[in-house]
Amino acid sequence: MSIKDRLMTYAEVLEHEPMKKHTTFKIGGCVDYYIYPKNCTALMCVLEILAQENIPYYVLGRGSNVLCSDTDFHGAIINLDRTLNDFYFEPDGVLVAQAGCSIINMAVEAMKRSLTGLEWASGIPGSIGGGLYMNAGAYKDNLANHLIDVCVLKDNTICWMKKDELDYAYRHSIFQSHKDWTILVGRFQLEKGNQNDIRDLMDSRRERRMSAQPLDKPCAGSVFRNPEEIPAWKLIEELGL
């Protein structure tokens, strides 16, 4: 049985898939296997096959903040957007979100429930898994500020890790030092707020972001880290870049 046939037992598999189809910057060569696992159990089986065949892999979110080489990647890309993309709101304002969830969709649904905490995220075109990996944020807020814990697949075992175990800082998490760990679920604590105020703030911040980073144009997203003294965007504008 071929590697593709083995993988297709547990996933949808695209061979020689152009990465430019899967990044917001619309660049990237082809990858040998682009994989959509059917569920969490299937993901574990896919990872086992890749390990047995010594196939390198990356887990990709929605392709923002990613620069892919034009050189073909002889390995696999695993995408969780199609199957691990559910989220739930508990009565006390806890949001439980799988790794493939859209950050924008989560922010909108939180607003509909008058829950505050994700207004800054209404224009960020990433997934919750990618957001937790790099601690996505904007307007002096970020995911870690609202995080309770993360469900992680590591060493073929699923476990929950509390926020204080995850070494969160500005655009940093422990996951960047453990690239063999796979983020499955995040849990966040949101608070009750005024729906009109939440909506107005989301609208203004989304409009500001879309004016600089339109979603309908090839764009890598906000890729520069902010120095402490002055925002990166201000430096770029003053330099005329």
Sequence positions of predicted segments:
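Anion-binding (especially nucleotide phosphate/pyrophosphate-binding) glycine-rich loop
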Residues: 2-128
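Phosphate/pyrophosphate- and phosphate-bearing ligand-binding catalytic cores of soluble enzymes
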Residues: 14-15, 21-23, 66, 153-241
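A generic alpha-helix structural signal
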Residues: 43-47, 107, 147, 199-202, ...
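A generic local secondary-structure boundary/capping motif
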Residues: 65-66, 107-110, 118-122, 135-142, ...
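Short flexible/disordered coil segments
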Residues: 36, 79, 116-129, 180-190, ...
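Short, well-ordered alpha-helical segments in soluble proteins
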Residues: 110, 128, 132, 136, ...
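Generic structural signal for well-ordered, non-membrane alpha-helical segments
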Residues: 43, 99, 103, 143, ...
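Structural signature of FAD isoalloxazine-binding scaffolds in flavoprotein oxidoreductases
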Residues: 28-29, 35-40, 67-85, 133-163, ...
